[in-house]
């Protein structure tokens, strides 16, 4: 019912910001890294909102030494955020890898790429076998529950009955909470970072603003190539970035160097740079779909409400908030912790807003390290 393909791991150029991280262990051929694989589900995959796909693909990365029955290693599963990928060593380099907090030698570490992503898992940028062209808007709408179900297919394919530790930040946190409810006996311990359990009007407003930005690009609806909507994507990313960061963070990094300049531009050029940076590695159609999946987040839907759904979680949970997070204010994480039996709450101090979950590595390590199996 499945097949998989193994790819060699890639090493960034030595001049990248991750060069030191890779250099630390690349001198020894015996050190283990995460490798890229693909899971192909040959049955029909039915989507929650309707529609189906045959041959659903989920790209994932895992520790190089394969998981085996009766393996003594503990399983750590990482759920990534909106535009990240399954190569957690790439976007969380201080925490994932040999000798790091999530040690890919000591543990069997897995990270699956979300459905709808531009990094290989099935989504609007995938090729429709009926047309030989990308699906674009013919791909079914994706919910958080669809993403979790697809990830669970990978878990079953790997032969993993229990996930000893799960961690996710932002939309990765959505997945972690939802998974704890959908498969309550599977996840032993989890850390939910900077996330919510029901999409707020505030968050939906941001998502709609980004969709509007994409739709203003006339090439977006033409569906002529995956470069369609590129300028709209840059604008959407600029909008998103404001929600990810904070007033204090911008003030700490984006003041003009010339106090006498007539027209401030440093922060503006930074927004344009970040917009182009995303459009160089992502596509507008995947972004559009993933924003839609965020709007589906509601753990209480069909379960009697959010509080009742959270009350069914049997996973040992730690919830982490960030004091400067404007996208998911700490009130949301405190609420989550108050509804889950036995959950604990921690708060990170950061000037970087929501993105603090990617940057405040020392504080995260202090919280997570004592919880690891």
Predicted features by range, described:
Residues 33-75:
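Catalytic-loop region of hydrolases
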Residues 61-129:
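N-terminal cap/lid subdomain of alpha/beta-hydrolase-fold enzymes
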Residues 303-306, 329-338:
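Short alpha-helix in the alpha/beta-hydrolase fold that links the catalytic acid
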